[in-house]
Amino acid sequence: MNHTSQAFITAASGGQPPNYERIKEEYEVAEMGAPHGSASVRTTVINMPREVSVPDHVVWSLFNTLFMNFCCLGFIAYAYSVKSRDRKMVGDVTGAQAYASTAKCLNISTLVLSILMVVITIVSVIIIVLNAQNLHT
């Protein structure tokens, strides 16, 4: 397709996508060998496995890696989250759930330990400042 035909096609359609309509059609199909008056009803059941949503906690792990990386637990949680996402893309739901569970535990421990360290640091600074003020008075 050369450039002039492409320009002609886009100019003819006005640059907008074509308008599609849904057409519903029904057909009757008679079974071979069966009389028309006594048609048997057959039921077909199709079991469709429902898509299991496995949370991989990648965003939480990335946040912990960037902002609360206590003893590199956030980075390890991020690695497990990526493994969980890879397993989910392959279709291994059990493996994805196992990696996601490990990532969740690591994220919780990272969050708790990091908050605990922030609180200990703030309390330590307050105690040091108060002791320094008492020594100067």
Swiss-Prot record:
Conditions for induction: By alpha interferon. Induced in pancreas during caerulein-induced pancreatitis. Induced in pancreas under systemic-lipopolysaccharide treatment and in intestine under Salmonella infection.
Post-translational modification: Polyubiquitinated with both 'Lys-48' and 'Lys-63' linkages. Ubiquitination negatively regulates antiviral activity. Lys-24 is the most prevalent ubiquitination site. Phosphorylation at Tyr-20 is required for endosomal and lysosomal location.
Cited Pfam families: CD225 (PF04505)
Presence of the UniProt keyword Protease in the record: no
Role according to the record: IFN-induced antiviral protein which disrupts intracellular cholesterol homeostasis. Inhibits the entry of viruses to the host cell cytoplasm by preventing viral fusion with cholesterol depleted endosomes. May inactivate new enveloped viruses which buds out of the infected cell, by letting them go out with a cholesterol depleted membrane.
Transmembrane annotation, as ranges: 110-130
Linked residues for Glycyl lysine isopeptide (Lys-Gly) (interchain with G-Cter in ubiquitin): 24, 83, 88, 104
Disulfide bond sites: none
Residues bearing the modification Phosphotyrosine: 20, 27
Subunit structure: Interacts with ATP6V0B. Interacts with CD81. Interacts with SPP1; the interaction reduces OPN expression. Interacts with BRI3.
Segments of this protein annotated with the region Interaction with VAPA: 108-133
Superkingdom of origin: Eukaryota
Keyword field: Antiviral defense, Cell membrane, Cytoplasm, Endosome, Immunity, Innate immunity, Isopeptide bond, Lipoprotein, Lysosome, Membrane, Palmitate, Phosphoprotein, Signal-anchor, Transmembrane, Transmembrane helix, Ubl conjugation
Intramembrane segments: 58-78
Protein name according to UniProt: Interferon-induced transmembrane protein 3
Membrane topology per record: Single-pass type II membrane protein
Expression tissues: Expressed in acinar cell. Predominantly expressed in nascent primordial germ cells, as well as in gonadal germ cells.
Residue positions bearing lipid (S-palmitoyl cysteine): 71-72, 105
Compartments in which it is found: Cell membrane; Late endosome membrane; Early endosome membrane; Lysosome membrane
Region described as Interaction with SPP1: 60-93
The family this protein is said to belong to: Belongs to the CD225/Dispanin family.
GO biological process: defense response to virus; host-mediated suppression of symbiont invasion; negative regulation of cell population proliferation; receptor-mediated endocytosis; response to virus; type I interferon-mediated signaling pathway
Species this chain originates from: Mus musculus (Mouse)
Keyword field contains Membrane: yes
Cytoplasmic side: 1-57, 79-109
PANTHER family, per database record: INTERFERON INDUCIBLE TRANSMEMBRANE PROTEIN, INTERFERON-INDUCED TRANSMEMBRANE PROTEIN 3
GO cellular component, one term: lysosomal membrane
